[in-house]
């Protein structure tokens, strides 16, 4: 087979197939809001160790799809993190926070 026929058939060694379906595992466990589970009503901005669970290594607030928090508590977490940053309990940016 010539290289032209191999490229047309798509059976060349080491060839990447772009139209093949990816094996995406959609059976992941559902994430639940830890605040609803524990019954936490108030998120304390002075507890920086607890708030570090909701920021990444650079100090950015993690999105809901990664943390699993509900919309109501995600807003409260973001307000608490912003207050903690303003009062210097947490840094605004960091190279490696954790």
Swiss-Prot record:
Gene3D superfamilies: Ribosomal protein S18. Keywords: Ribonucleoprotein, Ribosomal protein, RNA-binding, rRNA-binding. GO terms for biological process: translation. SUPFAM superfamilies: Ribosomal protein S18 (SSF46911). Pfam families: Ribosomal_S18. InterPro entries: Ribosomal_bS18, Ribosomal_bS18_sf. One of its GO terms (cellular component) is cytosolic small ribosomal subunit. Belongs to the bacterial ribosomal protein bS18 family. Part of the 30S ribosomal subunit. Forms a tight heterodimer with protein bS6. HAMAP family: Ribosomal_bS18. Binds as a heterodimer with protein bS6 to the central domain of the 16S rRNA, where it helps stabilize the platform of the 30S subunit. PANTHER family: 30S RIBOSOMAL PROTEIN S18 (PTHR13479), SMALL RIBOSOMAL SUBUNIT PROTEIN BS18M (PTHR13479:SF40). This is Small ribosomal subunit protein bS18. The gene is rpsR.
């Amino acid at each position: 087979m010539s290289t032209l026929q191999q490229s047309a058939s798509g059976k060349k060694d080491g060839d990447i197939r772009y139209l093949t379906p990816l094996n995406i595992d959609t059976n992941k466990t559902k994430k639940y809001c830890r605040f609803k589970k524990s019954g936490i009503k108030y998120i304390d901005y002075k507890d920086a160790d607890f708030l570090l669970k909701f920021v990444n290594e650079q100090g950015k607030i993690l999105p809901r799809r990664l943390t699993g928090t509900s919309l109501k508590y995600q807003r409260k977490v973001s307000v608490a993190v912003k207050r903690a940053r303003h009062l210097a309990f947490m840094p605004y940016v960091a190279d490696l926070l954790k």
